[in-house]
Amino acid sequence: MGSSGIFGWIKRIRLLPPRDQEFFGLMEKLVDTAAEASQWLTEMFNGDPRRGQEFSTRIENCLTKCSQIEESIEGLLLRSQQPPFARNEIGTFSTDILRIAKFINHASNRYVIYDIPSSDKEMRELGTIIKEACDQIVEAVKSLRSNRNIEPVARAVDRLETKADEIYHGGLRRRFQEIRSDRSILDLRALG
């Protein structure tokens, strides 16, 4: 065996076990489920208000599934020899995605509990932005197997978050203006 044969043999020896690929499948399921919940929220805000409870139940089912997947990721983190990323990064990621699903569930739950007769412009716009952000996250997670650069997607999600903040604050401003206007009308009626 020549020197190139020995070096070739040494190069084929793996000193560390392969990175655990099971994480990618679980992370993809997690973000797909959160994206599904965001799709139901968008349909809830754009559809027939009488179907609110139906959409809310579907979103709650997505939240339950996200919670179960997040628990599976936590369990895998405990027993995995070599996860594809730092353990704390994976744990933070799964917790953050679960938090997104909880936020979506909370929004749908309030829509049903308060028996909102129809969604307003801001609700529909925010629903669309939440869906876009979830789709960006799905795209980023699916690319992680081959490309670790998720920076462009993170920037896109940040832009969507900024846009959502602007819509939210614009909606609040409009609401308070409506309240002031209604009070002024009531005050004029009381005087007149």
Residue ranges with predicted function:
Residues 1-192:
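Cytosolic, long alpha-helical scaffolding segments
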